[in-house]
Amino acid sequence: MKSRDKAILKDLHRFRCLSRDDIIDLHFQGLKKAVTSCNTVMKRLRRDGSVDVNVSQQPYIYFPQPSTIRKTSQKIPHFLAIVNVYKQLLQYEKPKLFKVEPKYGKGYMEPDIFTIWRQSPFFIEVQNSIYSKKMMQEKLSRYEFYFHSLEWQQEPWQPNKSKYFPSLLVITDSQYDIYSPNFRIFQAKSIHDFMNQMAVKA
């Protein structure tokens, strides 16, 4: 199997699913006939039984085989939104680490993403829908609970000397009245919007 095939399958497992255009952006950038090349490769991987596909959507949505989600799952737009955040991060710098829906234990937060990007750790929440103030406070309280547990100091990515609690970045079209005295919270409509906010502060 070619290294690009392996990289595509690795991303399909990591992101749960990818649209044909996502695969082009991540693995066929710069090719003259990127669409044709991608279609040919994905057709072969499908024939080999390495991937599954939902052809009822345009562009096609591809899944690893076996897949952890159904081809008709309601969470597909959510996972594709996570891919979109990853692609936006890449435009500035490739993340050193990028985990999709990492698990931290009972009672703790369930971020959509944990990433180390531009030498900084971030929890990222990708919000496609509007949450009530109560729901946002409940989300935030789980981060606070994790902060006070000090378990984050044992994370394998932590430096030996200083320990850092990740910043929380909420990707949302709505602004929420949320604050923590223990860690930084950012709200932005996109990674580009977030970078513009940082540029203004700098």
PLM features: residue spans?
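Active-site metal-binding core of divalent-cation-utilizing nuclease and nuclease-like domains
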Residues: S73-Q74, K87-F122, I130-E138
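Structured N-terminal alpha/beta-domain signature
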Residues: V85, K103, Y179-N182, N196-Q197
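Charged, structured surface patches that assemble and position nucleic-acid processing machinery
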Residues: N182-A202
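Solvent-exposed, charged helical/coil patches
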Residues: Q57, F63-Q91, F98-K99
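Nuclease-adjacent, charged terminal/linker segments that flank catalytic cores
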Residues: M1-R70
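Catalytic cores of nucleic-acid endonucleases
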Residues: N128-F183
